[in-house]
Regions:
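Cytoplasmic helix-loop-helix junction between adjacent transmembrane helices
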Residues: 137-176
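Juxtamembrane intracellular "pre-TM" segments in multi-pass secondary transporters
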Residues: 2-8, 231-269, 287-288
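C-terminal membrane-cytosol helix-exit motif in multi-pass small-molecule transporters
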Residues: 216-236
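Conserved MFS/SLC helix-loop-helix module at the cytosolic interface between two early adjacent transmembrane helices
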Residues: 93-132
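Transmembrane alpha-helices of Major Facilitator/SLC transporters
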Residues: 296-316
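Pair of pore-lining "gating" transmembrane helices in MFS-fold secondary transporters
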Residues: 9-59, 257-277
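Short amphipathic helix-loop junctions that connect adjacent transmembrane helices
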Residues: 33-78, 279-296
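Glycine-rich segments within core transmembrane alpha-helices of 12-TM secondary carriers
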Residues: 169-192
């Protein structure tokens, strides 16, 4: 390998590592806040006479299969938390392949900048999400712009050979683990730092605006880091030129290799299960063990350290 190629490879590894790390930090900041966040909006809507969360709760309570005391919202809150998390995941499911295909056509760098810019706008909305629908809108924007992870991973594949690609992907796993440690920690500690007095206005600060501000700051740092340091990894002669990008997920049935198709399906079901665990774990900790945000932080610290150990030693 030429010295210039080796330099590009090292630079790409560094930029992608920090990009994935910061992306996981801002993504996981809200994990320890989810139960408190939904309870806050329920209380707010109780004061102002209803809203999106209350309507959803009433809809859930209309089913006889839900046996819950009339004065308790806990079960319904957990369901809504899962729905909010699923909203982001479903949008990521559809849009990440689109961003990935687009990056095959125009390059990794511009797509990373587009997706990170959308992520910044989503967290900017979250700062002023006095009403729950604004929070939902910010999550929609974040889900649509959530292609940076797949594109950053593709950049690793661009600069590695088949023989050493597992080492590059292990680096991705370590960045995941580190982000999973710092993100929930920042989210848990930010809960005790309030930007301003909380009001019931539609666009206003909430007890979680400080976490949103931290997320926005890190997302902007991530955007600037890619803008300044990331060099394009996909050569022009390797870029596609066939019309509009198509979501690869809809081409799954056309995969001729049966083993590859089964592997893709298995990974799909695994990620659905894992994502469900991610977004319901905090509710389990609060409901079953009465965890505080600080104790949830400690739980995610342990999970993150385990991820780092597994990815750094076993995957590598």
């Amino acid at each position: 390998m030429k010295a210039s190629d080796q330099k590009v490879k090292r630079s790409t590894f560094g930029v992608v590592f920090l990009t994935i790390f910061l992306d996981m930090v801002v993504f996981s900041v809200l994990f320890p806040l989810f139960p408190e966040m939904l309870d806050h909006y329920l209380a707010r809507e109780d004061r102002i006479g209803g809203g999106l969360v209350t309507d959803f709760v009433d809809f859930i309570l209309s089913f006889s299969i839900v046996g819950q005391d009339a004065g308790s919202f806990r079960f319904e809150t957990v369901i809504f938390g899962g729905a909010l998390g699923s909203l982001y995941a479903v949008l990521q499911f559809f849009f990440a392949p689109i961003w990935g295909r687009l990056s095959d056509k125009i390059g990794r760098r511009p797509v990373l900048l587009y997706t990170l810019g959308g992520t910044c706008l989503g967290y900017l909305l979250w700062i002023f999400a006095g009403d729950f629908w604004i929070l939902v809108l910010s999550r929609i924007l974040g889900g649509v712009a959530s292609g940076n992870l797949s594109v950053a991973t593709a950049a690793i594949a661009d600069v590695t050979s088949r023989e050493n690609r597992s080492r590059g992907m292990a680096l991705v796993g370590i960045a995941f683990g580190l982000g999973f440690i710092l993100g929930p920690a920042l989210g848990g500690f930010s809960f005790y730092w309030q930007l301003s007095s909380v009001s019931d206005g539609i666009f206003s600060f909430t007890p979680f605006s400080s976490a949103a501000l931290i997320s926005l700051s890190l997302a902007v740092l991530n955007l600037l880091w890619v803008w300044v340091r990331f060099r394009e990894t996909l050569a022009e002669d390797k870029r596609g030129s066939d019309g509009k990008p198509k979501p690869a997920i809809f081409q799954l049935g056309r995969i001729e290799n049966d083993a590859v198709r089964k592997t893709c399906l298995a990974y799909l079901f695994y990620m659905i299960s894992f994502s469900g665990m991610e977004f319901t774990l905090t509710f389990l900790a609060v409901e079953r063990f009465s965890y505080s945000p600080r104790e949830i932080v400690n739980m995610f610290l342990l999970i993150g350290l385990t991820l780092i150990f597994a990815q750094g030693f076993f995957v590598r």
